[in-house]
């Protein structure tokens, strides 16, 4: 789905607008999803994710891996398939 949060899995919800006379009209509620670049320290690279603003607050507080784990997600959901199973190369340490 296009408008779905990667961390929480929240998506568009449908329901009714109910007037004072209890007349019901169908409507949808869209999740406030933004595209955000997040740095994965373990893999030493940037990843673009679609994340809800509520999940972004959790992410800033706990970190990406903990936030995804708390919501029952998997980190491989945001990792492109060509990177799954590949360990990042160690960065050379400058000594002077």
Swiss-Prot record:
Coiled coil: none annotated. One of its GO terms (biological process) is translation. Transmembrane segments: none annotated. GO terms for cellular component: ribonucleoprotein complex; ribosome. Pfam families: Ribosomal_L28. Keywords: Ribonucleoprotein, Ribosomal protein. GO terms for molecular function: structural constituent of ribosome. It comes from the Bacteria. InterPro entries: Ribosomal_bL28, Ribosomal_bL28/bL31-like_sf, Ribosomal_bL28_bact-type, Ribosomal_bL28_sf. HAMAP family: Ribosomal_bL28 (MF_00373). NCBIfam families: L28. Belongs to the bacterial ribosomal protein bL28 family. This is Large ribosomal subunit protein bL28. It comes from Leptospira biflexa serovar Patoc (strain Patoc 1 / ATCC 23582 / Paris).
